[in-house]
Protein backbone atom coordinates (compact mmCIF):
# COMPACT_ATOMS: atom_id res chain seq x y z
CA UNK A 1 0.00 0.00 0.00
CA UNK A 2 1.29 3.44 -0.97
CA UNK A 3 0.70 6.08 1.71
CA UNK A 4 0.32 9.63 0.42
CA UNK A 5 0.81 12.58 2.75
CA UNK A 6 -1.41 15.53 1.84
CA UNK A 7 -0.45 18.95 3.13
CA UNK A 8 -0.51 22.64 2.29
CA UNK A 9 -0.78 25.98 4.00
CA UNK A 10 -4.09 27.23 5.38
CA UNK A 11 -6.62 28.17 2.70
CA UNK A 12 -4.94 26.20 -0.08
CA UNK A 13 -7.80 23.71 -0.57
CA UNK A 14 -6.54 20.73 1.41
CA UNK A 15 -9.97 19.67 2.67
CA UNK A 16 -11.48 19.90 -0.82
CA UNK A 17 -8.63 17.84 -2.30
CA UNK A 18 -8.92 15.22 0.47
CA UNK A 19 -12.64 14.92 -0.25
CA UNK A 20 -11.91 14.33 -3.94
CA UNK A 21 -9.38 11.59 -3.13
CA UNK A 22 -12.10 9.95 -1.00
CA UNK A 23 -14.65 10.28 -3.85
CA UNK A 24 -12.11 8.53 -6.09
CA UNK A 25 -12.04 5.54 -3.74
CA UNK A 26 -8.91 6.33 -1.71
CA UNK A 27 -9.21 5.82 2.09
CA UNK A 28 -8.54 9.21 3.74
CA UNK A 29 -7.42 10.08 7.27
CA UNK A 30 -7.75 13.69 8.42
CA UNK A 31 -5.57 14.87 11.31
CA UNK A 32 -7.89 17.88 11.75
CA UNK A 33 -10.94 15.62 12.09
CA UNK A 34 -9.02 13.50 14.60
CA UNK A 35 -8.24 16.63 16.65
CA UNK A 36 -11.94 17.61 16.61
CA UNK A 37 -12.89 14.16 17.92
CA UNK A 38 -10.17 14.23 20.56
CA UNK A 39 -11.18 17.73 21.73
CA UNK A 40 -14.60 16.39 22.66
CA UNK A 41 -13.20 13.10 23.96
CA UNK A 42 -10.07 11.80 25.60
CA UNK A 43 -7.87 14.86 24.99
CA UNK A 44 -10.24 17.24 26.80
CA UNK A 45 -9.28 16.38 30.42
CA UNK A 46 -5.57 16.43 29.52
CA UNK A 47 -5.91 19.86 27.90
CA UNK A 48 -7.90 21.21 30.85
CA UNK A 49 -5.14 20.02 33.19
CA UNK A 50 -2.52 21.81 31.07
CA UNK A 51 -4.59 24.91 30.22
CA UNK A 52 -7.19 25.40 32.99
CA UNK A 53 -10.44 27.06 31.90
CA UNK A 54 -10.26 25.97 28.26
CA UNK A 55 -12.74 23.08 28.53
CA UNK A 56 -16.51 23.54 28.92
CA UNK A 57 -18.93 20.64 29.45
CA UNK A 58 -16.21 18.16 28.54
CA UNK A 59 -15.40 19.83 25.21
CA UNK A 60 -12.37 22.01 24.43
CA UNK A 61 -13.37 25.60 23.67
CA UNK A 62 -11.13 26.19 20.64
CA UNK A 63 -11.34 29.99 20.91
CA UNK A 64 -10.19 29.96 24.56
CA UNK A 65 -7.44 27.46 23.76
CA UNK A 66 -6.27 29.60 20.83
CA UNK A 67 -6.03 32.64 23.13
CA UNK A 68 -4.10 30.57 25.69
CA UNK A 69 -1.40 29.58 23.20
CA UNK A 70 -1.26 32.31 20.54
CA UNK A 71 2.19 33.83 20.21
CA UNK A 72 3.61 31.57 22.94
CA UNK A 73 5.92 28.89 21.52
CA UNK A 74 6.28 27.11 24.88
CA UNK A 75 2.51 26.86 25.31
CA UNK A 76 2.17 25.53 21.76
CA UNK A 77 4.81 22.88 22.52
CA UNK A 78 2.88 21.82 25.64
CA UNK A 79 -0.33 21.52 23.62
CA UNK A 80 1.40 19.51 20.90
CA UNK A 81 2.92 17.19 23.53
CA UNK A 82 -0.64 16.36 24.65
CA UNK A 83 -2.37 16.16 21.26
CA UNK A 84 0.18 14.79 18.77
CA UNK A 85 0.63 11.33 20.37
CA UNK A 86 -3.16 10.83 20.41
CA UNK A 87 -3.49 11.93 16.78
CA UNK A 88 -0.67 9.56 15.84
CA UNK A 89 -2.50 6.65 17.53
CA UNK A 90 -5.58 7.37 15.43
CA UNK A 91 -3.48 7.60 12.27
CA UNK A 92 -1.83 4.25 13.01
CA UNK A 93 -5.26 2.63 13.48
CA UNK A 94 -6.41 4.12 10.14
CA UNK A 95 -3.35 2.73 8.34
CA UNK A 96 -3.98 -0.74 9.74
CA UNK A 97 -7.62 -0.65 8.59
CA UNK A 98 -6.70 0.64 5.11
CA UNK A 99 -4.06 -2.07 4.72
CA UNK A 100 -6.54 -4.72 5.87
CA UNK A 101 -9.12 -3.49 3.33
CA UNK A 102 -6.66 -4.13 0.49
CA UNK A 103 -6.39 -0.48 -0.58
CA UNK A 104 -3.62 0.20 -3.12
CA UNK A 105 -3.31 3.82 -1.93
CA UNK A 106 -4.23 5.53 1.35
CA UNK A 107 -4.02 9.24 2.08
CA UNK A 108 -3.19 10.99 5.35
CA UNK A 109 -4.19 14.67 5.44
CA UNK A 110 -1.79 16.36 7.87
CA UNK A 111 -1.65 20.20 7.88
CA UNK A 112 1.76 20.33 9.62
CA UNK A 113 3.25 17.36 7.73
CA UNK A 114 6.71 18.90 7.24
CA UNK A 115 6.67 20.92 10.45
CA UNK A 116 6.16 17.79 12.59
CA UNK A 117 8.45 15.50 10.56
CA UNK A 118 5.50 13.35 9.48
CA UNK A 119 6.75 13.30 5.87
CA UNK A 120 9.15 10.55 7.01
CA UNK A 121 6.12 8.30 7.60
CA UNK A 122 4.67 8.59 4.08
CA UNK A 123 5.78 7.28 0.69
CA UNK A 124 4.91 10.36 -1.38
CA UNK A 125 3.97 13.94 -0.51
CA UNK A 126 1.14 15.85 -2.21
CA UNK A 127 1.06 19.62 -1.65
CA UNK A 128 -1.98 21.78 -2.43
CA UNK A 129 -1.11 25.28 -3.58
CA UNK A 130 -2.71 28.47 -4.87
CA UNK A 131 -1.55 32.08 -5.30
CA UNK A 132 -1.26 34.07 -2.04
CA UNK A 133 -4.10 36.46 -2.93
CA UNK A 134 -6.52 33.55 -3.42
CA UNK A 135 -5.30 31.96 -0.18
CA UNK A 136 -5.88 35.14 1.86
CA UNK A 137 -9.33 35.73 0.35
CA UNK A 138 -10.40 32.16 1.19
CA UNK A 139 -9.09 32.26 4.76
CA UNK A 140 -10.44 35.70 5.68
CA UNK A 141 -13.90 34.62 4.47
CA UNK A 142 -14.00 32.01 7.26
CA UNK A 143 -16.20 32.83 10.29
CA UNK A 144 -14.18 34.33 13.15
CA UNK A 145 -10.98 34.62 11.11
CA UNK A 146 -8.93 37.82 11.39
CA UNK A 147 -5.66 39.10 9.90
CA UNK A 148 -4.06 38.58 13.35
CA UNK A 149 -5.15 34.94 13.51
CA UNK A 150 -4.02 34.31 9.95
CA UNK A 151 -0.58 35.78 10.69
CA UNK A 152 -0.25 33.63 13.84
CA UNK A 153 -1.10 30.50 11.84
CA UNK A 154 1.21 31.32 8.92
CA UNK A 155 4.16 31.93 11.27
CA UNK A 156 3.96 28.26 12.31
CA UNK A 157 3.71 26.95 8.75
CA UNK A 158 6.58 26.38 6.32
CA UNK A 159 6.18 28.80 3.36
CA UNK A 160 4.23 27.54 0.36
CA UNK A 161 7.24 27.78 -1.98
CA UNK A 162 9.30 25.49 0.26
CA UNK A 163 6.45 22.99 0.56
CA UNK A 164 6.14 22.88 -3.22
CA UNK A 165 9.88 22.29 -3.59
CA UNK A 166 9.71 19.31 -1.19
CA UNK A 167 6.60 17.73 -2.75
CA UNK A 168 6.40 14.73 -5.05
CA UNK A 169 3.15 16.12 -6.48
CA UNK A 170 1.74 19.67 -6.45
CA UNK A 171 -2.01 20.22 -6.88
CA UNK A 172 -2.93 23.66 -8.23
CA UNK A 173 -6.22 24.52 -6.51
CA UNK A 174 -6.70 27.93 -8.14
CA UNK A 175 -8.80 26.52 -11.02
CA UNK A 176 -12.12 24.70 -11.24
CA UNK A 177 -13.18 21.66 -9.22
CA UNK A 178 -13.11 19.60 -12.41
CA UNK A 179 -9.51 20.64 -13.03
CA UNK A 180 -8.57 19.57 -9.50
CA UNK A 181 -10.36 16.23 -9.96
CA UNK A 182 -8.37 15.67 -13.16
CA UNK A 183 -5.06 16.36 -11.37
CA UNK A 184 -6.01 13.96 -8.56
CA UNK A 185 -7.09 11.24 -11.02
CA UNK A 186 -3.69 11.53 -12.74
CA UNK A 187 -1.87 10.98 -9.43
CA UNK A 188 -4.02 7.96 -8.53
CA UNK A 189 -3.65 6.38 -11.98
CA UNK A 190 0.08 7.06 -12.06
CA UNK A 191 0.65 5.39 -8.69
CA UNK A 192 -1.79 2.48 -8.90
CA UNK A 193 -1.68 1.80 -12.63
CA UNK A 194 -5.50 1.77 -12.53
CA UNK A 195 -8.02 4.51 -13.41
CA UNK A 196 -9.42 6.43 -10.43
CA UNK A 197 -12.96 5.46 -9.41
CA UNK A 198 -15.75 7.69 -10.68
CA UNK A 199 -15.66 10.93 -8.74
CA UNK A 200 -19.29 11.81 -9.28
Curated annotation (Swiss-Prot):
Identify a single GO molecular function assigned to this protein.
Answer: ATP binding
Q: Which domain of life is it from?
A: Bacteria
Question: SUPFAM superfamilies given for it?
Answer: P-loop containing nucleoside triphosphate hydrolases
Kindly list the biological process annotations in GO that this record carries.
coenzyme A biosynthetic process
Q: Does the keyword Transferase apply?
A: yes
Q: Which family does the similarity line name?
A: Belongs to the CoaE family.
Name of the protein this chain belongs to: Dephospho-CoA kinase
Q: Which organism is it from?
A: Brucella melitensis biotype 1 (strain ATCC 23456 / CCUG 17765 / NCTC 10094 / 16M)
Record lineage: Bacteria, Pseudomonadati, Pseudomonadota, Alphaproteobacteria, Hyphomicrobiales
Gene responsible for this protein: coaE
Amino acid sequence: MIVLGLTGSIGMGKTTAAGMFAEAGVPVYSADDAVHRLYSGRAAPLIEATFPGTVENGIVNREKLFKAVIGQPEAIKKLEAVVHPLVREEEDAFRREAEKSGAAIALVDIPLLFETGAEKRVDKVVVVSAPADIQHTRVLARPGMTQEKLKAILVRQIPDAEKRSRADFVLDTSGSFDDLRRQIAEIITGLSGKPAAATR
